[in-house]
Amino acid sequence: MYSKELGINFFGNESNKKNQLNKIEILKKNINNFKIFLVIAGTNTSQISGISAAGINAKSRRKTALADAEFLLKGASKDHKYKLPLLNAGVTPALISHVCAKLINIHPVIVPLGLGVKPYFNHLVVEDRDLGPSNCLTTGKSMSKKRVINLYEKGLAIGKSSKQPILISESVPGGTTTAQAVMEAFGLRVANLVGSSLFKAPRELRKKVVQKGLLNANLKTDFDSFDVVAAVGDPFQAFSMGLLIGARLAKQSVILSGGSQMLAIILLVLEFLDLKNEDDFIEDVFIATTGWLVKDNSLSDLLDIINEKYDVKLLGLASPLNFKFSKYKELKDYELGHVKEGVGAGGISLLAFLDGFKNEEIVSLCQQNLEMMKVLGQISLEKDC
């Protein structure tokens, strides 16, 4: 459904227009009060050739999350430490998120998990950095259950202490594949619905990877969400489960900014909680993404499956941001289906639109930052990766 007044596409729950507009008003009242979390996490699933567009090769994908976080915080800067990996097409969605976060005057909180290095910029310390990335999901042993529970409990505590609404975003190369594995572990047949940062989703490759992981995991009939994340998930999922539950226990609204990775979080939470009325929990939870990710309806279909399976009414919102008239190929590539989403681009740009900023303003600032990135050599050349 499309809201002409707001330029926003609604998907998922077919609630009436009045209810949708009421929900939007909730967000509009709190725009400048949101706390944005960017969870940057490592999984060795990202090292599989052809699995992700978040970097042109396996080596560059190890740096992607750090470079995204740095750019989200600082934008184009001569003092950058991490070069943004060269992509086959497009440019990091951190560009969009940085521009829009500055417009609405929100300073994101970075949560590094499983990266193996300590970022030089301000960040939230949740676990020992020496733990490193989770294993490739094909092993069926991504992480120890102890690590999963620790990450969940840390997220839960942070969420429960929240005094303001939160937005959860991510930069997890390989994360759509772990998301698919988690959903399929719970019986959802989603191989043809889970999206990708790549122009053409590597569905056959992902199907083989997920099947191998689930076979090796050998999950029994009495498994729970922790078991699934430990088997085929990633650190982002464990932490974000807790963060979402904690924030809702604190009666805060939550925007899950992304696509299939955020739906995997919802699924894990709904499987984990013994709720008498799931709708009370979901009431002020929103999935927010970019218009590019919902173009082919796959994400909407995926959301419908979850709404039906768990008898909830989760609402999806798609940002109206577009680069149709941009003068730069890297931005126009988004219109062709490249990159699509990441680093909270959908949710953060949605908040900027709800705060009254126009598409032309956002595009202009994205172009200015892109120009500076090029001048400052902030995008790596392939030979540097």
Curated annotation (Swiss-Prot):
Transmembrane segments: none annotated. One of its GO terms (molecular function) is nicotinate-nucleotide-dimethylbenzimidazole phosphoribosyltransferase activity. It holds the Pfam family DBI_PRT. InterPro entries: Nict_dMeBzImd_PRibTrfase, Nict_dMeBzImd_PRibTrfase_arc, Nict_dMeBzImd_PRibTrfase_sf. It comes from the Bacteria. HAMAP family: UPF0284. This is UPF0284 protein P9215_05181. It comes from Prochlorococcus marinus (strain MIT 9215). The lineage of its organism: Bacteria, Bacillati, Cyanobacteriota, Cyanophyceae, Synechococcales.
